[in-house]
Amino acid sequence: MTAVTLAHNTMHSDRLSRRSAVVVFLAFALAYFFSALVRAITATLSPTLTDEFSLNAQDLGLLAGGYFLGFSFTQLPLGRLLDSHGPKKVVLAFLTFAVLGCLAFAWADSFTGLLAARVLCGMGVSACLMAPLTGYRRWFDANDQLRSNSWMLMTGSLGMLAATLPVQWLMPIWGWRALFVMLGIMIALAMVLIFMVVPLWRTTSTNEDPAAKVIQDDGSYREIWRSAYFWRMTPIGFFSYGGMVAIQTLWAGPWMTQVAGWTPTEAAKGLFLINLCMLVTFWLWGLMSPGLARRGIPVERLIAWGLPMSFVVIASLAWMGPSIGTGAAVGVALLCVSSTVVALAQPAVGMAFPPHLAGRALSAYNLVVFAGIFVVQWGIGLMVDAGLGMGLQKPAAYQMALACFGVCSGLSWVYFLLKRPIQA
């Protein structure tokens, strides 16, 4: 039995009509769009922030990773809150901190201020994906859950797309500080829409959820931590999924400028291409996932077959280094696109547990992913600085860091293959 088939435990009485489901999806998608824009904007702003605050590679990695550090801090309490109070109340409360974080970043006058604001932003938007996925677990059927997950990620890619050339174009007009003020305003508007259209959470649902009758839910993560399926998915979530996002949202830009020799404007165009490719890829996953499930092709098999393509691309990029030249954006795009199959692990983990545990299961796995993003983002920066300290040229230091990341990702895939696939 795969994780997808376990989704039939969903509470049918809570299903939304098609029209209501679309409206709710769009409201959550708007908030997630802005959260992804906030996440990815440091890749475009990295040359400006590096010059203005005299940042090195380690500082830049820590600054970008601060978002994910703040995100990780909230995941375990977030899961309990989602299961208890529902997506609407939780996401509105959390987004208040995101607005404050954007304003704090706009007025920061030191690296410490920037880092604190990024952590606050990360904490604030940390419910923007988990809240809707928890709601979809109850409101949508199994096929729509797979599709909506992919299309939420597509919306995130659209936000990352907006963080590239559009931000580059607005920089000479507004400056980066005004951009963050505007982001805070737009997130507040998304909060208003969520307040208006997202349904409240029904807490008295044990009549519809057979699992809730026999399990005395104490709000703990005990069932999650005991799940062999969860632990099977953990290393690939940490290294491959986390690494994909770390590269997409930070190190893609420096790879193009520091390794391939591109200008900041050329790198912004490259980031636009990368995120456009990611957007199209997640849209296609949303179209294909229900059909693949109906054909009996489980998520686990897709990951086992598909993820090795990313290792080939990582090895090629690390080997070619500066010689990739004008093909740098295409190479990084291939790396990110070939890694997207691992994103299917997240809804699979959520559907491997009964609905009353969905918020905790999804948040626990999201903690794994975002801890991976933080570690990979900062770790690559540390490796680059270590390589420079060893006397390597900057491109060679980046090549060494990417190769180390590739080895870690490959080992996580081997663990996934060898771990006995016991379901929750």
Predicted regions: what they are:
Residues 73-112:
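Conserved MFS/SLC helix-loop-helix module at the cytosolic interface between two early adjacent transmembrane helices
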Residues 54, 86, 107-113, 124, ...:
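Helix-breaking motifs and short loop linkers at transmembrane-helix boundaries and internal kinks
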Residues 42-43, 228-285, 373-381:
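Extracytoplasmic gate region of multi-pass secondary transporters
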Residues 151-202:
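Helix-loop-helix hairpin linking two adjacent transmembrane segments in secondary transporters
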Residues 8-17, 201-234:
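Juxtamembrane intracellular "pre-TM" segments in multi-pass secondary transporters
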Residues 97, 101, 112-120, 326-334:
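Paired small-residue
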Residues 23-57, 247-253, 376-380:
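Extracytoplasmic
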Residues 117-156:
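Cytoplasmic helix-loop-helix junction between adjacent transmembrane helices
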